[in-house]
């Protein structure tokens, strides 16, 4: 499976993901680090996955980074920002920070889903 790391990274970087979003996952595969997710991180991952299911998105592992950002923005609008909040909030620093936070969470979690999908669909190349 280690042989698939570089092609995976290359594909994901080509889709606009940053090395930061991929680094943790790749380092876990190579044994260079282990990831112990906090309760908060697990809850965020569940929220992302639940939202993907709610939107009935089957091809999330093939999304480019721009599409992930749009999805994160929709999520913030649908689930985080209370209805009826005035338009001024949408341009505030607080809102931008909130949106950036959720974009990072979506990027990280979807990179993880993409890695699992990539390795599952390409494992035949190394299982010989």
Kindly give the residue locations of the regions a language model identified.
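Short, extreme N-terminal segment that most often corresponds to the first beta-strand
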Residues: 1-37, 125-128
């Amino acid at each position: 499976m280690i042989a698939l790391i570089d092609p995976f990274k290359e594909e994901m970087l080509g889709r606009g993901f940053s090395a930061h979003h991929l680094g943790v996952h790749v380092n876990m595969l190579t044994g260079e680090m282990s990831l112990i997710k906090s309760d908060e991180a697990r809850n965020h991952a569940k929220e992302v996955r639940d939202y993907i299911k709610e939107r009935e998105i089957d091809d999330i592992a093939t999304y480019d980074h721009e599409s992930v950002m749009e999805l994160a923005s929709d999520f913030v609008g649908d689930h985080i920002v209370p209805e009826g909040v005035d338009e001024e909030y949408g341009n505030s620093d607080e809102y931008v920070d909130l949106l950036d936070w959720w974009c990072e969470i979506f990027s990280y979690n979807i990179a993880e889903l993409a890695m699992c999908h990539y390795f599952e669909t390409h494992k035949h190349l190394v299982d010989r």
